[in-house]
């Protein structure tokens, strides 16, 4: 029986609020979850990806790397050892969620299962989604708040621009 694999994608807005943008979960063979991982990386383009060291490197690491290159699924993958108990490993994310929250789209098809697992942890039957969020917690020191989008540049139809916006570095000789 294959182990359940979970991928989560987190985003952070300019106010440092964390959003669970996407989640994939499946009890599948390695090739299936690797394709799901590539799909998420291509869709969301995350800056970092946390994964368990032993499980990935010793098992499917070369295949994952090859598929990522073939699919152009580029991100900075960071491996963390899976030591200690799961409740301890989830503490950094638990603290982050307690202070600044974790925003989740309630209409998401995976929301009910995620909520049930979070509320029953550590006594619940399943903890794979908690593990995935705990891995995100390992990256908290690298996560920065997002930036507000810059307003679009307005181009005047007559071709004139204010001198403060002119980027040609005029000198007194060209006036």
List each model region and its residues:
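Conserved beta-strand -> loop -> alpha-helix junction used to position metal-binding or nucleic-acid-contacting
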Residues: 70-96
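RNase H-like, metal-dependent nuclease domains and their acidic two-metal-ion catalytic environment used
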Residues: 1-79, 104-175
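Short glycine-centered helix-capping/turn motifs at secondary-structure transition points
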Residues: 100-101
């Amino acid at each position: 029986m294959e182990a359940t694999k979970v991928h989560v994608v987190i985003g952070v807005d300019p106010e440092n609020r964390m959003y669970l943008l996407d989640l994939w979960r499946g009890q599948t063979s390695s090739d299936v979850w690797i394709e799901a991982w590539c799909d998420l990386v291509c869709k969301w383009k995350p800056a970092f990806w946390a994964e368990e060291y032993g499980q990935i490197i010793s098992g499917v690491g070369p295949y994952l790397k090859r598929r990522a290159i073939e699919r152009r699924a580029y991100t900075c993958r960071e491996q963390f050892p899976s030591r200690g108990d799961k409740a301890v490993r989830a503490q950094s994310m638990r603290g982050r969620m307690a202070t600044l929250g974790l925003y989740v789209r309630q209409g998401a098809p995976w929301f009910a299962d995620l909520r049930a697992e979070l509320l029953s942890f550590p006594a619940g039957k399943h903890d794979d989604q908690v593990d995935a969020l705990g891995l995100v917690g390992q990256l908290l020191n690298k996560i920065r708040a997002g930036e507000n989008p810059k307003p679009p540049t307005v181009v005047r139809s007559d071709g004139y621009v204010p001198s403060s916006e002119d980027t040609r570095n005029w000198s007194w000789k060209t006036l």
